[in-house]
UniProtKB/Swiss-Prot annotation:
It is found in: Cytoplasm. Keywords: Cell cycle, Cell division, Chaperone, Cytoplasm, Isomerase, Rotamase. Belongs to the FKBP-type PPIase family. Tig subfamily. It comes from Maricaulis maris (strain MCS10) (Caulobacter maris). This is Trigger factor.
């Protein structure tokens, strides 16, 4: 085998591989001898078919099989000998005439074109300095949650005033209704004993408002228009009339924060409810703190590393992002600041995001590789099982999906690997804790107030990872700048959602047509 370097520019390499015809013929002869004892042909005793006859009958077919084995084998051998780490699957192109090669009249010649991984020295984690903002759970936060829970769980009773009572905002009106389009009753537009909480916004615009002032026994005709984006396409944008009969009026009772509230929520007493809320908020603050320190870390890593990126990797990442951006454009979901930008301007911004994602992905991968960080089978199995429980009754199908789809497993593995590398870096880095308010902790970088005095915690270990923590900073290969934009949160946010397996969650039961699309 002869290997000739045809091109070398930046991270691109092209090699020509030549396997001489004599070598191919020797391989063919060896293969024929290997299979000869098993060949069965009419007119010959088993295992006694002449080599020349086998070559004549099956030579080209056997040679084709040999070439199919040779291409990946020689490609890998070339990569190993040249000590190359491909950034993506090499492109293979055969340049010799297949007919002549199969007939043993020509050398087998093919080219390998590939992009290699950049060679760079990753930053020393011990020399990195990052900030971890932390916020304590305040009593006011718990009190606010208690009031909200009390209001949400309060009971309703028949409204005082008897037949003279009128429906007010916050009341529940019990009604029968029949919906009509152009005078005709439509499917799904009728219900009996429906409970309408005025002001909740659970029904289509105008429905609840027209019940204000209604009395028990009263009949009303409600004129409404279904939203243009209504879930039932046949009703979207259409005017409808609902004939309503009021059967009952209920008003909310006093919202009390007491032991009874806690018991209704499944806890022993009010103190237990307060403790549960504190733990929940502490967990949420911890997740947000983790996201912020990780974002700071990724920003520092991005600033520390400047090296050439494999064009195909960047192109593939950009294509993934742009598909979602294009969808956001079609749905008119771009942020106001982006709506007046040209397509070229938007593409330029998102290409920078793609480059950042790829750069950070390569940096974290290299740090992980050099420090023997890997994802164990136990960690992977745990993640798959956690995904499976999201699909009640279909857990087995989800697990089988991952067992049969290596790409899906790779998608599951990537964020786990990244979090382990981030944990490793944070254990060695100089982490400074900053006590901030809850508002500052959850504010975007461009909205955050001035930083308060810092409390240094040298080389403090990162907190334990939170289960199911949602973060705009994972995986790092999917990291976008801190710039806030709804479209960019969908298309360029730091984690592109993994594709769901074939087993889907069951759809909830359809609501009455009068209710708006959730």
């Amino acid at each position: 085998m002869n290997v000739i370097e045809k091109a070398s520019e930046g991270l691109s390499r092209t090699y020509e591989i030549v396997i001489p015809a004599d070598d191919l013929q020797a391989r063919l002869a060896a293969k024929i001898e290997e299979i000869r004892p098993e060949v069965r042909l009419k007119g010959f005793r088993p295992g006694k078919v002449p080599t020349s006859h086998i070559r004549k009958m099956f030579g080209e077919s056997i040679m084709g099989d040999l070439l199919n084995e040779l291409v990946p084998d020689t490609t890998q051998k070339t990569l190993d000998e040249k000590k190359l780490r491909p950034a993506s699957q090499p492109d293979i192109s055969v340049t010799s005439e297949a007919k002549d090669v199969l007939a043993g009249k020509a050398d087998f010649v093919f080219e390998i074109a590939l992009e290699i991984m950049p060679d760079f020295e990753p930053a020393d984690p011990a020399k990195l300095s990052v900030t971890r903002p932390v916020a304590e759970v305040e009593d006011a936060e718990v009190d606010e949650a208690l009031e909200r829970l009390a209001n949400e769980s309060r009971e309703f009773a028949a409204k005082k005033g008897g037949k003279n009572a009128k429906a007010e905002d916050g009341d529940v009106v019990v009604i029968d209704f029949v919906g009509k389009l152009d005078g005709e009753v439509f499917e799904g537009g009728s219900a009996e004993d429906a409970r309408v909480a005025i002001g909740d916004g659970a029904f289509i615009p105008g429905f609840e408002e027209q019940l204000l002032g209604a009395k028990v026994g009263e009949e009303r005709e409600l004129n409404v228009t279904f939203p243009e984006d209504y879930q039932a396409a046949q009703l979207a944008g259409k005017a409808a009339v609902f004939d309503v009969t009021v059967k009952g009026l209920e008003s909310p009772q006093e919202a009390k924060v007491d032991d009874e509230l806690a018991k209704r929520l499944g806890l022993e007493n009010l103190d237990g409810l307060k403790d549960a809320l504190k733990k929940r908020f502490a967990g949420e603050h911890g997740q947000q703190s983790r996201m912020k320190v990780k974002r700071d870390l990724l920003d520092k890593l991005d600033a520390e590393h400047k090296f050439d990126l494999p064009p195909k990797m960047v192109g593939a990442e950009f294509d993934n992002i742009w598909r979602e951006v294009a969808h956001a454009i079609e749905q008119d979901q771009l942020e106001d600041e982006d709506k007046n930008k040209s397509e070229d301007e938007l593409k330029s911004e998102y290409r920078e995001i793609a480059e950042r994602r790829v750069r950070l992905g390569l940096v974290l991968a290299e740090i992980g590789r050099r420090n023997n960080i890997d994802v164990t089978q136990e960690e992977l199995s745990r993640a798959i099982n956690q995904e499976a429980v999201k699909y009640p009754g279909q857990e087995r199908q989800v697990v089988e999906f991952y067992q049969k789809n290596p790409n899906a497993v790779a998608q599951m593995r990537a964020p786990i690997y990244e979090e382990k590398v981030v944990d490793y870096i944070l254990e060695l880095a100089d982490v400074t804790e900053t006590t901030v308010s809850k508002e500052a902790l959850y504010a975007d970088e461009d909205e955050a107030p001035a930083k308060p005095a810092k409390k240094a915690v040298a080389k403090k270990k990162a907190p334990a990872k939170k289960a199911a923590a949602k973060s705009d900073d994972k995986p790092a290969a999917k990291k976008a700048p801190a710039k806030k934009a709804p479209a960019k949160k969908a298309a360029a946010k730091d984690e592109a959602p993994a594709k769901k397996p074939a087993a889907k969650k069951k759809a909830p039961a359809k609501k009455a047509a009068a209710k708006k699309d959730a």
